[in-house]
Amino acid sequence: METWKRTVYISLICVFCTSFGVSQLAPILPLYFHDLGVQTPSAMSLWSGLATGATYLIVCLVAPFWGRIADKKGRKITLIRSSFGMALCNLLLAFQTTPEGVVIIRLIQGLVNGFYSATITLIASESPIERTGWALGLLASANLAGSLIGPLLGGYIADTIGIRNGFILVGILMGFAGLLATIFIHENYVPKPNVEKLSISKLKEQIPEFNSIVALCIASFIYAICIMSLQPVISVY
């Protein structure tokens, strides 16, 4: 098998595992706060909102930093850092005894997140130009499959073996993804020389559809708010 194809197929497994691990938390997080002593539905929703929002807020803030590191050091190291970091965070979640501890761990999880975005750039750079669309399409399907199956199986796992044991199991799964990435994913990375930072005006000149991209980002932001706002409250409802 060609090296780039092996990288694509292994990436599909890793992306599915990490997407599953991230999304499975949605239906059980409010119930976990209840186990930690949060009793009223309003308080459960509040703590769940804090824990959920904390992760994605930090992701938004640190994503440019990790992107810069990936440009300097390569994408594979980002995959390894993210998968093992999220694995450790899930393991730590299983041993929390206070709501504040859960929120802190979720903040840390936001710091180490970024597996899927790094995989996109890795596959785009490693795949032949004529097969890039095919590879990225498969990657998006794996990410979507993990995101859809995660809440379904997450609730079942928590009901079967308990919430804390579910966190441990998911942590092991993410660690497995990191192990696969470490051993089997290959990257032909060549460090790029330092380039001049572009101002917004110069960036607009180089990107013909700059305004359309900005509009798309705003629309995606609004869409994410609409979707994610339901996660902390749907289980309580």
Predicted regions and their residues:
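Juxtamembrane intracellular "pre-TM" segments in multi-pass secondary transporters
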Residues: 1-4, 186-218
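Pair of pore-lining "gating" transmembrane helices in MFS-fold secondary transporters
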Residues: 4-35, 212-229
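Hydrophobic core of transmembrane alpha-helices in multi-pass small-molecule transporters
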Residues: 16, 89, 100-114, 221
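Extracellular/periplasmic helix-loop-helix junction of adjacent transmembrane segments
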Residues: 31-59
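Residue-level signature of mid-helix packing/kink "hotspots" within the transmembrane helices
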Residues: 56-64, 114, 147-148
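Conserved MFS/SLC helix-loop-helix module at the cytosolic interface between two early adjacent transmembrane helices
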Residues: 60-97
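Cytoplasmic helix-loop-helix junction between adjacent transmembrane helices
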Residues: 105-144
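Symmetry-related core transmembrane helices of the 12-TM Major Facilitator Superfamily/SLC fold
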Residues: 166-183
